[in-house]
Amino acid sequence: MATAKQNETFADTLATVLHQDAEHTVYRLGGTDGEVVQTVFPVFPGIEIVYHDVHATACAMQRTRAPGCLEIHHCREGRIAYPYGDACFFLSPGDLAIVRRSAAAAPARFPTGHYHGITVSIDPARAPDCL
């Protein structure tokens, strides 16, 4: 059963938990002009993998991160534009971006209204020392 709740891991976005178990959580994000689903897999403390399935033109899908977090983004299909400071980076199929977050980002844009990709997030303050 899906439950709607304000989830503090998503900046200013109403997230509906579609499924949750010991291995992953599936969210549907609100506040969009279409459908945005994120599947989140915690790997280790401070490290997670997020699959993005987007059929919308914009969404505040940025998960709240501590300053200094490292994100590795890969676009499998579609296109995404992420604001970053005074600039913006665009990913097309096959593109990869490595970003160090200093603050929460503005909403992502999807010029084609379609995006499938993956993000690996690493919070060095919480990640195991062996990594």
List each model region and its residues:
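N-terminal regulatory/effector-sensing and dimerization cores
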Residues: 27-131
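A short, N-terminal "cap"/entry segment at the start of jelly-roll beta-barrel domains
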Residues: 1-42
